[in-house]
């Protein structure tokens, strides 16, 4: 899987209409391994922010990251309260999807359900190649954008509160090939056998 971090930037007002564009509107390669994409949700996806985001939190472990998040809340209580207001969130928020092409993995495990029949699928850090819980380039990008837009930079709540990594691509991407025999997409990200499907 990709090394990933999912961050967000909530703008102070609706003047930019961030929702009124394609879902992935821009991207930049900040170094040889790190690619940042800017993603928008539709203007009626406010629940996403209320459930998934916390104040931007720096590097640390399962003890220090929650403490850093709490310190951020104490230092900026009004910003934190503004962040909690879910109404209109998706219409003024950019998701900052940070991806790295480093070799790491998430392990899947089937475990029996605690009550009842069946199994549940759980994920764990791969012991040999764990994916990172913090990507510095992503936090720097979120801080830079917040400073230049007067917005509020945010981390995924599981990353900030429990130092658990997040990913939007748990099974990897589409294989790039020279033909349908050895890939799903070509070098220009076009799906083989389809027109206008990127």
Give residue ranges: language-model regions.
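A generic structural signal for short, solvent-exposed coil/turn residues
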Residues: 30, 88-90, 100, 115, ...
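A glycine-rich dinucleotide-binding beta-alpha-beta segment and adjacent secondary-structure elements
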Residues: 94-97, 120, 125-198
């Amino acid at each position: 899987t990709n090394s990933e971090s999912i961050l967000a930037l909530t703008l102070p007002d609706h003047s930019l209409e961030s929702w009124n564009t394609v879902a992935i509107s821009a991207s930049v390669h900040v170094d040889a391994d790190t690619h940042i994409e800017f993603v928008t949700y539709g203007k009626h996806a406010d629940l996403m922010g209320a459930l998934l985001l916390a104040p931007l939190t720096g590097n640390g472990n399962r003890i220090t990251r929650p403490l850093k998040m709490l310190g951020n809340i104490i230092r900026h209580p009004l910003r934190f309260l503004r962040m909690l207001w879910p109404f209109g969130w998706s219409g003024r928020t950019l998701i900052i999807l940070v991806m790295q092409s480093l070799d790491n993995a998430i392990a899947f495990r089937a475990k029996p359900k605690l009550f009842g029949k069946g199994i549940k699928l759980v994920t764990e850090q791969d012991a040999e190649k764990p994916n990172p819980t913090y990507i510095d380039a992503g936090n720097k990008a979120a801080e830079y954008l917040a400073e230049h837009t007067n917005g509020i930079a945010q981390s995924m709540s599981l990353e900030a509160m429990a130092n658990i990594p997040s990913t939007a691509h748990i099974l990897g991407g589409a294989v790039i090939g020279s033909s349908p025999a050895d890939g799903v997409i070509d070098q220009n990200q076009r799906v083989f056998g389809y027109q206008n499907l990127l």
